[in-house]
């Protein structure tokens, strides 16, 4: 009797593939957007703690504001416990301040940027990421993303001054398979991944050694367990005669 393929097990959604959401601290979002309050008031908050959330590359900062509200924020590089931050459209543009991006001077580094006011922050959120404010025009702000692409966002969108902490994290190599296993487990990835043709015949259609390596194309209506490899391809194999050099 054969075994279910990895894609079948993943689709079933067993405990191995289920996202360990109970380990998460909470969403790293800005407070609910109140235009009147955000534009006319400046709240002062204090960083109570810097925390690690399994599965997240950047740390999280627990911030408590003077009105008693708390939130988890993605901290910029250099933010420390006990440091004050400011929340408001007209807040001073200092490290950690959450401001309206339309009021940020051109050339400033920002992170955790909203595309539309109130969406909680969508851009430049991973460790070491930042965007550069390029220009303001007609209620829109041009920013340069980490990919060097220039994007237009609403000038009323919120952003954090500074670059996200934990930059250079991916430069450190894993070195051991065990490190990769723990990292994958925190993100609910299946590791290690075994090639189908390296398996036994009962575990995968491409497994076993009694037939040549590789598979025939699978039709679109193939049953689960057979639908692997080339699925309803237009063609397979090497394209012959495509790369001929033109003659003089």
UniProtKB/Swiss-Prot annotation:
Source organism per entry reads Thermofilum pendens (strain DSM 2475 / Hrk 5)
Q: Which domain of life does this protein belong to?
A: Archaea
Residue ranges with Basic residues bias: 227-242
The Swiss-Prot or TrEMBL record annotates one GO molecular function as: rRNA binding
Asked if the record carries the keyword Ribonucleoprotein, the reply is: yes
**What GO terms describe the biological role, i.e. biological process, of this protein?**
cytoplasmic translation
| InterPro entries in the cross-refs | NA-bd_OB-fold, Rib_uL2_dom2, Ribosomal_uL2, Ribosomal_uL2_arc_euk, Ribosomal_uL2_C, Ribosomal_uL2_dom3, Ribosomal_uL2_RNA-bd_dom, Translation_prot_SH3-like_sf
Q: Which UniProt keywords apply?
A: Ribonucleoprotein, Ribosomal protein, RNA-binding, rRNA-binding
Q: What is this protein called?
A: Large ribosomal subunit protein uL2
Q: Briefly state the protein's biological role.
A: One of the primary rRNA binding proteins. Required for association of the 30S and 50S subunits to form the 70S ribosome, for tRNA binding and peptide bond formation. It has been suggested to have peptidyltransferase activity; this is somewhat controversial. Makes several contacts with the 16S rRNA in the 70S ribosome.
Listed under subunit, the entry gives:
Part of the 50S ribosomal subunit. Forms a bridge to the 30S subunit in the 70S ribosome.
Keyword check for Ribonucleoprotein: yes
Starting at the broadest rank, the lineage of the source organism is:
Archaea, Thermoproteota, Thermoprotei, Thermofilales, Thermofilaceae
Pfam families assigned to the protein according to its UniProt record, in alphabetical order: Ribosomal_L2, Ribosomal_L2_C
Recorded GO cellular component terms are:
cytosolic large ribosomal subunit
> What gene makes this protein?
rpl2
